[in-house]
Design a protein with these regions (language model features):
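Terminal amphipathic helices with adjacent charged low-complexity linkers/tails
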Residues: 2-60, 64, 98-100, 125, ...
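Polar, glycine-rich mid-to-C-terminal structural blocks
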Residues: 156, 160-221
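Flexible helix-coil linker/hinge segments at domain or subdomain boundaries
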Residues: 23-33, 129-145, 175-181
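Extended, hydrophobic alpha-helical segments in both membrane/secreted and soluble proteins
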Residues: 18, 73-83, 90-150, 162-169, ...
Length: 277
């Protein structure tokens, strides 16, 4: 929670009263106060949240699914109460972060998409959450886009008549489906292009020179890439980045692209794949 004041005394009065309210209602367990330039630490931590969550060990990971749902701020408490009940029915843990002040909390269920149950829950959680968001007249994608993940549920969210208008508009302006095909209309099933393979066999991964036992193996390490592209740093933004990308600005030279390559290669250790190599 961010406070502003013309003087340090006024600012101190505001956050002191706020902390007292939290303590009175037994909300929270720590109340750190950051002043001036120190506030950047809090915002940096929030930005790093996605990458930090991807460092959990094992195949059960927080997934992008319902993290972009948004409702009116006054409806957010009731929405979150009902969403929690949905997730409890599936017996899944979840993480929550981001901007409550805009009516949007990034809720990420922790699922194992390499198991059949995880994939079924993946679809059903989004289906039930879509109905919940619709109930509160919210948005499935309050900050970003529906895309291939949520596009399948646009007819459910908007209604068939409105969706038919979307299709008609797309046909008029892009009859050949050149621009961003399958993102808003005629979207393929949400689980048609999952990056993970339920049949992954990690027993035949080759020995590597470097030790990746802390991440279990090199495949698990490559799977930690969330795809968010935070690695695409330049001399202007600062931060560590491969010099090859700094020079070429080519996606294939990014850390993300190399993680994708390793995941695709080591994730398909079938006999047919071995023969192709």
């Amino acid at each position: 929670v961010e406070f502003f004041g013309d003087t340090l005394e006024a600012l101190t009065s505001k956050y002191t009263k706020f902390i007292a309210i939290l303590q009175e209602n037994e909300q929270g367990f720590a109340y750190p106060v950051l002043i001036g330039d120190e506030t950047k630490k809090a915002w940096d931590l929030r930005k790093a949240g996605l990458g930090l969550l991807r460092n959990l060990p094992g195949d059960t990971q927080p997934v992008n699914l319902i993290e972009d749902c948004a409702v009116a701020v006054e409806d957010l408490p009731d929405y979150m109460d009902e969403l929690e009940l949905i997730l409890q029915r599936f017996h899944v843990q979840y993480s929550v972060y981001a901007h409550a002040g805009a009516g949007e909390l990034h809720v990420e269920p922790m699922l194992n998409l390499k198991e059949e149950k995880g994939r079924k829950d993946f679809r059903e959680i989004l289906k039930q959450t879509t109905e919940l968001v619709k109930k509160y007249k919210g948005s499935l994608s309050g900050e970003h886009g529906d895309g291939r993940l949520r596009g399948e549920f646009i007819p459910q969210m908007m209604g068939e008549k409105v969706y038919a208008l979307f299709q008609e508009t797309k046909q008029i302006v892009d009859p050949n489906g050149v621009f961003n095909r399958g993102k808003i209309v005629d979207t393929p099933p949400m689980d048609a292009f999952l990056r993970v393979d339920s049949l992954q066999n990690t027993n035949h991964l080759p020995q590597t020179v470097f030790d990746f036992s802390a991440q279990e193996n090199i495949l698990r390490l490559s799977e930690k890439c969330s795809g968010s592209g935070d690695c695409r740093k330049t001399e202007i933004t600062g931060g560590t980045m491969c010099p090859s990308f700094m020079a070429t600005r080519q996606e294939q030279q990014t850390t993300r692209a190399r993680a994708n390559m390793l995941r695709n290669f080591y994730g398909d250790q079938t006999e047919a794949h071995a023969n192709q190599l």
